[in-house]
Amino acid sequence: ASGAAATVAGGINNTANGSYSFAAGNRAKAIHMGSFVWADATNSDFSSVANNTFNVRASGGYTLTSNAAGTSGVRLPAGSGTWNSLSDRAAKENVVPVDSLDILAKVGALPLSTWNYISQDASIRHMGPMAQDFAAAFGLGENDTTISTIDADGVALAAIQGLYQQNQQQAQLIAQQQQVIADLERRVAALERGSKP
C-alpha cells in the first residue's frame, strides 16, 4: 500500500496506490483515490476504474442476502449481467391472486415521464413512474420513495395478462361479428337473386 492512508488487507500481488484505497484478494489494483477493490482467485489483474468506486471481481457470481438465515436476497450468477431476485414459492406467504384487468386500468392511469436524477447529469435520462404514484396505485413495496424491480415486473406482467384477456374477448367478438356479417351477406345475395334467404 503506497497511497496515503491506503490498505492492502491480504491476499497476494495486490496494490493500493490510490489515497484512502483498499485492495484484497489476488492481483487487486486499487489505483484510484478512495477506491475499494476485491479480486477473486482469477490469475489476472483487476483494477479500479475511477475515484471513489467499489470494484469487485467474483467470477463465480455474487450473492447478497438480506436476512440472518440467508434465505432472502439477490444473486448475480457467474457470467450474467442481471440480478436474480428471490421468488421461490416456498419463501412466500399471504399469496393472493390479482385482477389483471384492474391492474391494466391502473397502469393506464399511472403517470409516466422521463427525468434525470438530481445526482446525475441532466443528459442521463430515465423513464418511469414516480414511486409515490406507483405506491398509491398498487400498494406494493416497503415505502413510497422506491420501486422494487420485483413489483414493477409483477405489475407489468399482470397488465400484459389484462391485455391478453381483452385481446381474447375482442377476438371472440370479432369472430361473432364476422359470422353475423357472413349470414347477412348470404341473405342479401339471396334477396338479390330473387329467392328467399
Identify the residue ranges that each predicted region occupies.
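C-terminal intramolecular chaperone/auto-processing assembly modules
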Residues: 94, 140-197
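Stable alpha-helical elements in mature extracytoplasmic
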Residues: 91, 103-106, 130, 156
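Residues that recognize and position ribonucleotide moieties
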Residues: 127-128, 153
